[in-house]
Amino acid sequence: MITISDAAQAHFVKLLADQPEGTHIRVFVISPGTAQAECGVSYCPPDAVESDDIELAFNGFSAMVDEKSAPFLEEASIDFVTDQLGSQLTLKAPNAKMRKVAGDAPLVERIEYVIQSEINPQLASHGGNIMLVEITGEGVAVLQFGGGCNGCSQVDITLKDGIEKQLLDMFPGELTGVRDVTDHQHGEHSYA
């Protein structure tokens, strides 16, 4: 469920040494499954352990995860990184905003998951996003661009060389193409 690097484990052991005996860490997600999802790590004293918590054992401590956060922490990783500016814990939880879907889930759910977890975070750097409108009977994903992508002069390249290529590679035999139905209006909101 959660991978904690050796460096991060050593850091937690050091921090927990100054806490009351039996204290572990808690990894959690606030507002899981939403665009506002935020992940965190806190101390978890023995009296804060809930009966439905999931306990993950590590070297010298345990990480407690509440039942509601667990599916959103699949494939999460915690690392302790040191560089010229100092040291910091990093927590990456790719499924915090949207629960990972099973490989046998309906095509529309799997495509929506890829859009929300992989494509939209890339487009967000330009203030843009896409939305899946429908999948046609011919297997074409009909998309609508929003934000900075609406009216952007690079939208055709983004669609064909980026999004379509990625989706066709991920869903061969199920998806035959992508189509943009956005009424593009170039304006100050447009990225380029």
Swiss-Prot record:
Entry keyword annotation includes Kinase: no
Cofactor descriptive note: Binds 1 [4Fe-4S] cluster per subunit. The cluster is presumably bound at the interface of two monomers.
GO biological process: iron-sulfur cluster assembly; protein maturation
Binding site for [4Fe-4S] cluster: 149, 152
Origin superkingdom: Bacteria
Keywords for this protein: 4Fe-4S, Iron, Iron-sulfur, Metal-binding
InterPro entries assigned: Fe/S_biogenesis_protein_NfuA (IPR017726), FeS_biogenesis (IPR000361), FSCA_dom_sf (IPR034904), HesB-like_dom_sf (IPR035903), NIF_FeS_clus_asmbl_NifU_C (IPR001075)
GO molecular function, one term: iron ion binding
Required cofactor(s): [4Fe-4S] cluster
Key word Repeat present: no
Pfam families: Fe-S_biosyn, NifU
Similarity section: Belongs to the NfuA family.
Listed NCBIfam families: PRK11190.1 (NF008392), YhgI_GntY (TIGR03341)
Function: Involved in iron-sulfur cluster biogenesis. Binds a 4Fe-4S cluster, can transfer this cluster to apoproteins, and thereby intervenes in the maturation of Fe/S proteins. Could also act as a scaffold/chaperone for damaged Fe/S proteins.
Quaternary structure, from the entry: Homodimer.
Protein name: Fe/S biogenesis protein NfuA
Organism: Shewanella oneidensis (strain ATCC 700550 / JCM 31522 / CIP 106686 / LMG 19005 / NCIMB 14063 / MR-1)
Gene (name only): nfuA
